[in-house]
């Protein structure tokens, strides 16, 4: 296991880590010796990711969690503490969008659903994990937002609004957490090659590529490398960088 980031032996939760970005983050953390709690709503995917990490010599457990349900988030944090003794890193990756939808077709229930999935879930997980980080006077929280939070986009008002809220949540919590040596950061991810992207809109990638100077969309490993940078155990004052 690599250890030059100083994170070997730390305990991490990665929500939505059964595939895509979350899987990439979980596997990258494990490669550096972090003990990872894989969490997903799809048990087959989540168990497979955890098993894959263990097969490569890493430490990982799986916990089913619907991040829209407060009691399940609380149970996830409690299970992690039971298994690993604490929570050092919380990666709020779980969330998602849907196929493009005109804003005037959005009813209250659909808008609320995506706010709860993308924004409330991060808030609830931080609230549950924070006491453990505060007690040990250290912690790293990384929230995953989206480029749509900054520049918007047609037919995604509900998703963009929720992800913009994640940025506001992060900057506010970063100020409150800093006195306890807890960093809270947000990564504003670009279009990333994940199964969810292709399921939501199979033609989107082809339309997007000509607009990207490098000619490729991001890979989960690109996001994972950003997470590794933010959780490294070196002095940093970038408690609210994005």
PLM regions and their residue ranges:
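A conserved structural motif in NAD(P)-dependent oxidoreductases
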Residues: 212-223
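Alpha-helical segment proximal to the catalytic Tyr-Lys
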Residues: 131, 175-179
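Substrate-binding pocket helix/loop in short-chain dehydrogenase/reductase
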Residues: 101-103, 107-112, 197, 208
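Conserved small/polar residues in nucleotide/adenosyl-binding loops
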Residues: 235-242
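Residue(s) in the substrate-gating loop at a strand-loop-helix junction
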Residues: 146
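Active-site helix of classical SDR
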Residues: 126, 162, 170
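Canonical Rossmann dinucleotide-binding motif of NAD(H)/NADP(H)-dependent dehydrogenases/reductases
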Residues: 4-37
């Amino acid at each position: 296991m690599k250890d030059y980031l100083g994170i070997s032996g730390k305990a991490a939760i990665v929500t939505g880590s059964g595939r895509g970005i979350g899987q990439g983050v979980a596997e990258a953390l494990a490669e550096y010796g972090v003990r990872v709690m894989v969490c997903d709503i799809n048990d087959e995917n989540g168990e497979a990711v955890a098993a894959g990490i263990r097969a490569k010599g890493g430490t990982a457990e799986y916990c089913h969690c619907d991040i829209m349900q407060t009691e399940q988030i609380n149970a996830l944090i409690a299970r992690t503490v039971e298994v690993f003794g604490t929570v050092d890193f919380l990666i709020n990756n779980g969330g998602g969008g849907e196929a493009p939808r005109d804003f005037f077709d959005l009813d209250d229930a659909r808008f609320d659903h995506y706010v709860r999935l993308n924004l409330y879930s991060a808030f609830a997980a931080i609230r549950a994990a924070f006491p453990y980080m505060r007690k040990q006077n250290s912690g790293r929280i990384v929230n995953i937002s989206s480029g749509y939070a900054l520049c918007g986009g047609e037919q995604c008002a509900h998703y963009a609004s929720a992800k913009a809220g994640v940025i506001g949540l992060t900057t506010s919590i970063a100020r409150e957490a800093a006195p306890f040596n807890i960093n809270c950061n947000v990564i504003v991810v670009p279009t990333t090659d994940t199964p969810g992207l292709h399921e939501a809109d199979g033609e989107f990638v082809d339309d997007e590529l000509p607009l990207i100077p490098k000619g490729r969309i991001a890979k989960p490993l690109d996001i994972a490398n950003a997470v590794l940078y933010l959780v490294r155990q070196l002095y940093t004052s970038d408690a609210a960088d994005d």
